[in-house]
């Protein structure tokens, strides 16, 4: 498949699938959505309306420089070595306003808005924001090369993790 053959519906289906895999805690399949070189970044707000611009120079809410970091996170989730995730929260991701911003032969730039509901300790939390994806196009389909998550409500009562966004 080339990026020109990848339809808008293919991109939407890929994004929906990733969200479902998080909600279902299908960690192995979720990791398969990511290229080995994938960067996962959720920058902090420097002030009320400015995001930090470099994860190596500024504090980030989440930063993994490649898929190995995500694999390590999943290992800790599975082994219950993550006190911040025990018990595992129940999540539901809602995706909206998916746009393809740019296409090349090998990549697709997309953005979308999301809202995640999270239930844990008899409390309901809501997280919402905008995500920016660089998707790699290959004969085997789409994979995430870069995921930048802009969390719009960054007042966090408990923890924020990869399954929330």
Swiss-Prot record:
Gene3D superfamilies: 3.10.450.50. One of its GO terms (molecular function) is 2-chlorobenzoate 1,2-dioxygenase activity. Its EC number is 1.14.12.13. Transmembrane segments: none annotated. The keyword Calcium does not apply. One of its GO terms (biological process) is 3-phenylpropionate catabolic process. CDD domains: ring_hydroxylating_dioxygenases_beta (cd00667). It is an enzyme of class 1 (oxidoreductase). Keywords: Aromatic hydrocarbons catabolism, Dioxygenase, NAD, Oxidoreductase, Plasmid. Pfam families: Ring_hydroxyl_B. Pathway: Xenobiotic degradation; benzoate degradation via CoA ligation. The keyword Oxidoreductase applies. It catalyses: a 2-halobenzoate + NADH + O2 + H(+) = a halide anion + catechol + CO2 + NAD(+). Component of 2-halobenzoate dioxygenase multicomponent enzyme system which catalyzes the incorporation of both atoms of molecular oxygen into 2-halobenzoate to form catechol. Belongs to the bacterial ring-hydroxylating dioxygenase beta subunit family. Heterohexamer of 3 large (CbdA) subunits and 3 small (CbdB) subunits. The heterohexamer is part of 2-halobenzoate dioxygenase two component enzyme system. The other component is a NADH:acceptor reductase (CdbC). This is 2-halobenzoate 1,2-dioxygenase small subunit. It comes from Burkholderia cepacia.
């Amino acid at each position: 498949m080339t990026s020109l053959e990848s339809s808008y519906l293919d991109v939407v289906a890929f994004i929906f699938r990733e969200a479902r895999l998080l909600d279902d805690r299908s960690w192995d399949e979720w990791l398969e959505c990511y290229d080995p070189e994938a960067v996962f970044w959720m920058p902090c707000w420097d002030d009320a309306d400015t995001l930090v611009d470099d994860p190596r120079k500024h504090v980030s809410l989440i930063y993994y420089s490649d898929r190995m970091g995500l694999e390590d996170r999943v290992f800790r989730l599975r082994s219950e070595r993550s006190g911040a995730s025990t018990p595992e929260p129940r999540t539901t991701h809602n995706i909206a306003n998916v746009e393809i911003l740019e296409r090349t032969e090998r990549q697709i730039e997309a953005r979308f808005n999301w809202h995640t509901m999270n239930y844990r300790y008899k409390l309901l939390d809501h997280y919402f924001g905008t995500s920016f994806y660089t998707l790699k196009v290959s004969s085997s389909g789409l994979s995430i090369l870069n995921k930048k998550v802009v969390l719009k409500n960054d007042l966090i009562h408990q923890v924020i993790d990869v399954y929330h966004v």
